[in-house]
Amino acid sequence: AYADGREKPTSVDKLPQAAQEFLSAHFKDLTVAYAVEEQKYTGKEYEVVYTDRTEVEFRSDGQWESVGRKYSPVPASIVPQPIQTFVSGSNYPGQFIRQIDRNAYTWEVELSNGLEIKFDNQFNVIDIDD
């Protein structure tokens, strides 16, 4: 067994099916730089990094936890509509979402200007941090 936080290289075809489907649906045109499996006390987690520095993290069941892009917006199809509406409205003109994280309780996005906005599960803004 691995100690908490122990990583080992893996390949995309060894990820859970849901993770593989997510990657092929949203990032099939990108080139994978590497993939790692991390053994934690709560189970395995996975991270895939592409050559353009896009990073995607998955839970053990293959559901995505985090998508981050260095120079491009995250796929609009993974951003819940209330968050898209909040960001694309008159609040933040010219900004795009370059990172999105989710867990059981909150969603958090980082805009291209570095601003971080946290939402609860009902998509109410609960924190804005620059």
Listing of model-derived features with the role each one plays in the protein:
Residues A1-D130:
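Long, terminal "pre-/pro-" and other extracytoplasmic accessory regions
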